[in-house]
Every structure is written in C-alpha cells, then in structure tokens.
Regions:
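A short, compositionally biased
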Residues: 44, 116, 144-148
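Acidic beta-strand-loop-alpha-helix segment within the catalytic core
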Residues: 3-6, 11-15, 121-168
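Generic structural "secondary-structure junction" signal
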Residues: 47-50, 59-60, 84, 92, ...
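Short beta-turn/strand-loop junction motif enriched in small, turn-promoting residues
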Residues: 87, 104-105, 138, 155
C-alpha cells in the first residue's frame, strides 16, 4: 500500500509517532476548548456581523472561541505558526502550521441550529498532518492522524477499503 499524503508530510516534517500523538492531543484539547466556549454563547449571541461577502458571518462566539484556541495553541506549541479564520496568519507559514476555524457553521449557530463545529488541523507546507473536529452540541469529537487512526470520541472509525469512488 502506498504511503499516505499525511504520513509522507509527517515524515518530511521530522515528526515521530510520539510527536504526532502529542500534537493530536493538543488539537483535541484546542477543539474541545473552542467547542465549550461556543456552547456558552449558544442561543445568547450579542453580536452578528457580515464579514464582507454576503452570508459570510462572524459572531462574538467565533471571536471568543478563537481567542481561547489561539491562547492554548500558543502555550502548548509556541513554535508552530497559526492560520486562523478570524484573525489571519501568524508565524512562519512554510513549516508546521495550525489551521483554525473556531466556528465552522456560523450561519447554523446564529440561527440556533445545532449543527456547527470547531475545526483544528495541522499542516506541513500545504499537506495535512492531523485534525480534530469538536461537534459540541452532539458531544462528539472526530480526530485522526497517520499511524494513529481516525476516531469519533474514542471509538475507531471504519473506513472503506475501496480506493476508487466508482468502485464503492
């Protein structure tokens, strides 16, 4: 079986399996902290603004969750750059980089629909390495990394062995 894009990126970044385990733990903690902050604001928004494009919203919950996530990432991984949806990029952008969407599904959130998430990913260059997605209303955390697997909470996800869509 050929090496996955994520596995190759992890190798090129010089990350050991224990590094990946630690970083996926950081991603999970950050996603969980962001999701908890979103739930504190759910149904109690004090600010909803249009970011410029029609239908592209930002709320006080987006901003509050992003602040908490960025603080946690800076404390636990100060040498890793960040690209965050609301505040933009910080740090060297060609190595390891956290990609943060503090409120994925802002429109749903703003309308009181419970289908929203906090998404945290780690990339090396343009290649994905690992990710964690907290769906706080459903109390679910999806996460995964090469060599570790993909999970919902702590239950392994089963993926198809089919490699081509037309064969599925």
């Amino acid at each position: 079986m050929p090496e996955s894009i994520c596995s190759r990126a992890a190798r090129e970044a010089g990350l050991s399996p224990s590094d990946l385990e630690r970083l996926v733990g950081v991603a999970r903690s950050a996603a969980d902290a962001g999701g908890q902050e979103l739930m504190r604001h759910y149904g109690r928004l004090s600010s909803i603004k249009n970011k410029g494009r029609s239908g592209d919203l930002v709320t006080n919950a987006d901003l509050a969750a992003e602040r908490i996530i960025l603080k946690l990432l800076a404390e636990q991984t100060p040498d890793i750059a960040v690209l965050a949806e609301e505040s933009g990029a910080a740090g060297q952008q060609d190595g390891l980089r956290w990609c943060v969407d503090p409120l994925d599904g802002t429109t749903n959130f703003a309308h009181g629909y419970p289908f929203f998430a906090t998404s945290i990913g780690l990339t090396f260059g343009q290649q994905p390495l690992l990710g964690a997605i907290a769906v706080p209303f459903l109390k679910e955390m999806y996460w995964g990394a090469p060599g570790i697997g993909a999970f919902c909470n702590d239950s392994p996800l089963q993926v198809s062995s089919c490699e081509r869509l037309e064969d599925s």
